[in-house]
A protein has these predicted regions:
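Short, structured coil segments at secondary-structure junctions
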Residues: 6, 79-80, 208
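Short, hinge-like loop/turn segments at secondary-structure boundaries
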Residues: 100-106, 191, 230-232
């Protein structure tokens, strides 16, 4: 585990190749995404490192249902009693009332690699968990300093990013884009609709934020929205 302080009381928690984020500025702590399965102890240790107990984790915001982002959800809810917030298109999948959707890789290479994707826990088994609050595009949540929901479909149908208004705007991107060797679209083999995903990146480029935090890749701190706008221009070429 790597614990990174992004701003005072805002932390990134990296487990292998995926990031989640603890927002501890308010009395009720909020977690954005829950990371890879069977790693709930990692988050409990992270809470301990920042001098908090599991019971102080009150809210978990889920950007989407993939198990590298939702894998610890059920275990963390059991450990903390936290409420879960997710988009209505993700909620039935998280609850386990509908099956996990499958991507449709187009190229021969992706079709050959597809069985490996499940083994990497992108589409592996997801333990059912409650979703207490279904959120809508543009909704301002009464948690995490007033997080604003941005529906960013493409990677999954109900994928969301969330924007914190503090610190000049902090955008929690989820997998709407990645920041590995520069800004990039989400991974093609695990994205339901890449054209829609690129439209969502354009939507994010219209927002005002200074910092961007990604599910995969490093934090962009300082004029992150300008970097997104340059990325949007690159996608349009």
């Amino acid at each position: 585990m790597a614990l990174e302080e992004i701003f005072p009381f805002i932390y990134g928690v990296r487990i292998l190749y995926v990031n989640a984020f603890l927002l501890a500025e308010d009395e009720a702590i909020t977690l954005v995404d829950s990371g890879l399965a069977n790693r709930e102890g990692t988050f409990l240790r992270a809470l301990s490192e920042i001098k908090h107990s599991p019971g102080e984790l009150k809210h978990i915001v889920l950007t989407h249902h993939h198990t590298d982002h939702a894998g610890n959800l059920a275990a963390l809810v059991e450990a903390s009693g936290a409420d879960v917030w997710a988009h209505p298109l993700e909620a039935p999948i998280v609850r386990g009332t509908v099956p996990l959707p499958r991507s449709n890789p187009k190229s021969i290479m992706l079709k050959m690699l597809w069985p490996l994707v499940g083994r990497l826990s992108i589409y592996g088994r997801l333990a059912p968990a409650p979703v207490d609050h279904e959120v809508a595009d543009g909704e301002e949540l009464p948690i995490g300093g007033g997080l604003k929901v941005v529906h960013t479909p493409g990677h999954t149908s109900g994928h969301i990013a969330v924007l914190m208004p503090r610190h000049g705007g902090v955008l929690f991107v989820g997998d709407a884009a990645t920041n590995i060797l520069g800004l990039r679209p989400p991974l093609g083999m695990s994205t339901l609709d890449m054209a829609q995903a690129k439209d969502s990146i354009r939507k994010l480029g219209e927002l005002e934020f200074e910092t961007a935090c990604f599910g995969h890749g490093g934090v962009l701190k300082g004029k992150a929205n300008a970097a997104f706008r340059r990325f949007v221009e690159k996608l349009a070429r």
